[in-house]
Amino acid sequence: MHQLVLLRHGESVWNKENLFTGWTDVELSPRGEEESRNAGLLLKEHGFVFDLAFTSLLKRAIKTLWIVLEQMDLMWIPEHKEWRLNERHYGALQGLNKAQTAQEYGDEQVKLWRRSYKVRPPALAEGDQRHPSFDPRYHSLSRDLLPDTECLQDTVERVLPFWQQQAVPALQQGKRILIAAHGNSLRGLIKYLDQIPDDDIVGLEIPTGSPLVYELDRDLKPVRRYYLETGKAG
């Protein structure tokens, strides 16, 4: 049996302020730090140990991982930062208040941008300093890999090469893996693992700071999945 734990980062300051975040690199809120500590303690209390960890290039996920590993006394294990685990890019909506955006564009339009599988929000304008091409952490990547906006389908397609090229080989070697990432990048992994239809995955809610445990068979097919806090199926 192979062990995989997925963890959405703790609450960020922009989660708290109800702003579209995407690839904007914001801090954890005090509540998010506490959620991360609790997740680490919970994993430790239940006897979980990891050989390898993955996270995104965004500090709310990185710090969540660090806090969890510190609580588990596992700061020494290898960790890999993968841009493909970044949150969905919300384009020109990044930094805008969700409620105010709904007032300006209408609830239905914003709902489409947020919750449809294939509809992208407005893209960043050419030359917008928020574009990842201006960020040094992405300078090693080809320009055509960097999004100016994404729908959920784009995010899923971005995440799957990470799964096939990084996670699968490690799991096949018997590594126990923790992935600390974001709501939409984790949706991509969950959609693939559980074979969830396009129309259903958009409504899947993933709580912040709650470890989602997968027990996988030799073919890496889920045998059991549950949130550690409750023991109930996710």
UniProtKB/Swiss-Prot annotation:
Q: Which GO terms describe its biological process?
A: gluconeogenesis; glycolytic process
- What protein am I looking at? 2,3-bisphosphoglycerate-dependent phosphoglycerate mutase
Give any Pfam family that matches.
Answer: His_Phos_1
Q: Where is the active site?
A: 9 (tele-phosphohistidine intermediate), 87 (proton donor/acceptor)
Record gene name: gpmA
Q: What does this protein do?
A: Catalyzes the interconversion of 2-phosphoglycerate and 3-phosphoglycerate.
**SMART domains recorded for this chain?**
PGAM (SM00855)
Which HAMAP family does the record cross-reference, listed alphabetically? PGAM_GpmA (MF_01039)
Q: Where is this site: Transition state stabilizer?
A: 182
The subunit structure is: Homodimer.
Tell me which UniProt keywords the record has, alphabetically: Gluconeogenesis, Glycolysis, Isomerase
MF terms from GO for this chain are: phosphoglycerate mutase activity
